[in-house]
C-alpha cells in the first residue's frame, strides 16, 4: 500500500519540509509515503473562491485517482493513536492506495468531501495547514510503529 498526502500549497517554510522529511524517510519501503502539492489558486479581494476551491478540488481528485480518499477536516472523525493504527491496518487489508487530502485556506471543495470514504479530524482546533503535514506524517508513522511492534510508540 502506498500513502499519498495531497495538499494545497507549494511554498512551505523550511521547518515544515524538515519535519515532514524526517518522518517520510522513516517509513518502510513497503509503505511509501508521497507528498503531492497542489498549487493554491490566486486569492485576492475579488477572487471567486468557489471557482478556486473547485479547481483545487479537481486537481486533488485527479492526483488521488482511484485511491481510497480520506479528507482531513475538523468535522471528521477524531482517532486516537490506537484507532489510527487500526485504520491503517484496514487500509492495508483493503489493498488500495490511500490519498489523504488537505485543503487550502477555505478548506476542501464539495467534490473532495463527496468523494471521501472517510474524514479524519486531527483536532477541533483550526490548525495551520503547513503544521498539519508534519502532524499527519508523524501520526501515520506512529500508527505504523504500533502495527509492527516497532519501539517508536510507547504506552
Swiss-Prot record:
Binding site for S-adenosyl-L-methionine: 72, 103, 122-127
UniProt cross-references to Pfam families, sorted A to Z: SPOUT_MTase (PF02590)
Keyword list, A-Z: Cytoplasm, Methyltransferase, rRNA processing, S-adenosyl-L-methionine, Transferase
Substrates-to-products reaction catalysed: pseudouridine(1915) in 23S rRNA + S-adenosyl-L-methionine = N(3)-methylpseudouridine(1915) in 23S rRNA + S-adenosyl-L-homocysteine + H(+)
Gene3D superfamilies: 3.40.1280.10
Domain of life: Bacteria
Enzyme kind, highest EC tier: transferase
Matching SUPFAM superfamilies: alpha/beta knot
Gene Ontology molecular function: rRNA (pseudouridine-N3-)-methyltransferase activity
TM spans (from-to): none
EC numbers: 2.1.1.177
An annotated GO cellular component: cytoplasm
InterPro entries found in the cross-reference section: Alpha/beta_knot_MTases, RlmH-like, tRNA_m1G_MTases_N
Cell compartments where the protein resides: Cytoplasm
Signal peptide: none
Keyword rRNA processing on entry: yes
Family: Belongs to the RNA methyltransferase RlmH family.
Function: Specifically methylates the pseudouridine at position 1915 (m3Psi1915) in 23S rRNA.
Subunit structure: Homodimer.
UniProt protein name: Ribosomal RNA large subunit methyltransferase H
Organism encoding this protein: Salmonella choleraesuis (strain SC-B67)
Gene: rlmH
